[in-house]
């Protein structure tokens, strides 16, 4: 049931590229989600982007830091950043990502 939404009730079908950084102490971290041609930007969609909602059986994680990418005046993508300010937020995020990856047949690789 792990899903991502940009507008409540409208599940995003495009699978993002996710980049993670974490402090040396493990207390803070950042997740950057890059969506190429997400469903929310389709011409027929009239919903407003109100944030990025990561929803699973534990609840939801919310970030309001969502930016659009435009090429020649047309929307081409979205970038959302979620900042984790504690080890507990990091662990919660990782649990969500494990569920999301399992449901979408995704893998994880360290760079």
From Swiss-Prot:
It comes from the Bacteria. Gene3D superfamilies: Photosystem II Psb28. Its main location: membrane. GO terms for cellular component: photosystem II oxygen evolving complex; plasma membrane-derived thylakoid membrane. One of its GO terms (biological process) is photosynthesis. InterPro entries: Psb28_c1_sf, PSII_Psb28_class-1. It is a peripheral membrane protein. Keywords: Membrane, Photosynthesis, Photosystem II, Thylakoid. Part of the photosystem II complex. HAMAP family: PSII_Psb28. Belongs to the Psb28 family. This is Photosystem II reaction center Psb28 protein. It comes from Nostoc sp. (strain PCC 7120 / SAG 25.82 / UTEX 2576).
